[in-house]
Amino acid sequence: EVFIAVADFTVPKSGDLHSAGVPPVTLRAERRVAKFRVLLKDKPSPVNGFSFDMTAHTVQMLLTSKTEPFAEGIDALGGMYYGDPALYELPCCMSTMGDFHSSGTERYQMCQTNSTVFSPFVFADPASELPIGIVDIDISGASGGYTYKTDQTFARTLAASKISGIVFETTDTYDDSSSQIRIDVVEATDDAGNPENAAALFDPFYEWNASSY
């Protein structure tokens, strides 16, 4: 949790420039981080019955973001010289607890605050939002059990004091060329076929406190 509090106030002065004391000032602290939530849905695949086991899973992924060009100097004609847009890459590793938690009629594993590796958060400016890409997703469970992967790229937006995220479910597609079967996962959908909203499935207070004090 990272909160920032800023306030403008006037320091009164007496006639001889000594301070007459500062009146009470109220500071409102606001969260300056964005949270990213990963959920694993307990939904067996239609044919092979693949699912996530009731064990802690390690989730690894790469968050990417293209930044705006910035002025690096002045060119020969006196104009500003802008470099090429950069690409930020943030490797993330988190773990779920082994238990499933109910939301509506479905069950999910999530990265809880007391897990071995915490869910990631990113410092965020309340005045703007940050589009990100999610790539290189790899999920592993218990030793000797399944591992899970996807080659898809997912797009999300991070914003201060808000939770973004993604819900994964298993498919029937797998690779058994190694000692551990690797099962393909996709973004989970609801009964209507719409992508599930990770932020809406659980109360935000599950992971953090009130947005301000």
Q: Where in the sequence are the language-model features?
A:
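Generic structural signal for short, flexible, solvent-exposed coil/loop and linker residues
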Residues: 25-27, 155-157, 169-174
